[in-house]
Amino acid sequence: MKLEEAINIIKEEYPKYDLISVVDYDNYFVFSIVPPNYTIEQYGEWFGGLVAVNKLFKLTMHFIPLQHNPAAYAKAVENNTKYF
């Protein structure tokens, strides 16, 4: 699966949310998304959950790094993050 396809899947599942970043990690593209028109200045820090697209099954899921390999995910965040 290519990133563009994962972006389309996320936009279809969460059409009103804005994409902030994506991490290419293992079998997932892990997205950070926020509600529309969200600004830190107006609402403060956003602590919403991460949403991932499984590259193999092309399905979305809530992603919790601690349920995977936290050290490997942290390394992926350092090296494989793209911001929108």
Predicted features along the sequence, with ranges:
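Short, non-transmembrane alpha-helical segments in secretory-pathway proteins
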Residues: 1-20
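Alpha-helix capping and helix-coil boundary motifs
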Residues: 2-5, 39, 68
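Residue-level detector of alpha-helical hydrophobic segments embedded in or interacting with membranes
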Residues: 10, 30-31, 65
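Intrinsically disordered, low-complexity segments enriched in small/polar residues
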Residues: 12-15, 23-26, 71, 81
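Amphipathic, interaction-prone secondary-structure segments
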Residues: 19-46
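Extended interaction regions within the primary functional domain
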Residues: 34-36, 48, 63, 77
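A short, surface-exposed beta-strand/turn
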Residues: 41-63
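Charged low-complexity stretches with an acidic bias
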Residues: 57-84
